[in-house]
Amino acid sequence: MVAKGELSPQALPMNRLFPAFVAVFFAAFTLIIQSSVQADTFGTSGNEFTIDFVNIGNAGNAADTTSYGAVPYEYRASTYEISQDAITKAMASGMANVTAGAFTGNQPAADISWYEAAAFVNFLNTSTGNTAAYDLTFSSGSWSMALWSSEQAWTAGGTNLYRNKDAFYFLPSENEWYKAAYYKGGGTNAGYWLYPTASSSAPTAVASGTNAGSAVYDAVASVALVNSAGGLSPYGTMGQGGNVWEWNESAFDGSNSLASEGRTIRGGDWGNTENLLRSSFRLDWVATDEYPINGFRVASVPEPSTYALLLMTGAGVLWMTRKRR
């Protein structure tokens, strides 16, 4: 007979193993969320294309000394810059009035304005049954944008009148872009690298390739393919330093309070020196600017499967907790 207040022999092992079980389960869950690569498919039959995404975890991380990089939620960033092939196939699938075309095939979509990049993002949303991220209008040969109301606007991390709260895909804000490029990962106060190649030493300049610690810059002949644009960031993105400059969603002053504000652009291009690839360097460009040296990547909320896994994890832990009582 078991004395009052004592654990039975059957209960003892679970009582001792439960904390370890929870720790291992959540560690495995975190690893899955942060390291998995997902491919989303878009376009119509014969013109389908995919965009690979990596998960950006460590929600609630601290900002860098530059004041950028803090993001209070998990999200996904495209592994690669958006390719010209994706633009071409989106146009063939119904997207209109986007004229990028400095390069071809799997080279980056360049010579593209902020508005055109935003229109591509809207296509990703509306063609998959989601809400458009940006309130865009194309009239008389040019794009314009209206701000969302405070009720319609994105509010995670602060009110963002550029982005709709129900959008699934969007251009990365400056903080989202910065974190994906420079944050070391592995916790909420891990710090930042100076370059988007998981290093504070200047990357090795290459014309193409995927070697760790390399980037396409320093007056190489031209751009590389988006999936051969240098080494990876800690989260697994490629080409955030060199190849082409990348539009950020954010206004240069960070307010996103006027549609006419200049937009931030980061990362440098294939002809730049290493200092332009650094976390400390950013430029203010007009949203209508189109040059062969500028492109973009996209971001999104986590896949529903991520939330489902989180709910399953919570339910499992709750069930185990009740079993111990």
Question: What residue ranges belong to the model's regions?
Answer:
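N-terminal secretory signal peptides that target proteins for export/translocation
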Residues: 1-20
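Bacterial N-terminal signal peptides
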Residues: 22-34
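Boundary at the C-terminal end of the N-terminal hydrophobic targeting segment
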Residues: 35-41, 303
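A short glycine-rich, aromatic-capped structural motif
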Residues: 43-98, 108-125, 242
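Functional-site microenvironments in short loops/helix caps that host divalent-cation chemistry
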Residues: 49-50, 118-278
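Short, structured beta-strand segments at or near domain termini in extracellular proteins/domains
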Residues: 291-300
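A short, hydrophobic C-terminal helix/tail in secreted or cell-surface proteins
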Residues: 303-320
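Short, charged juxtamembrane terminal tails flanking transmembrane helices
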Residues: 323-325
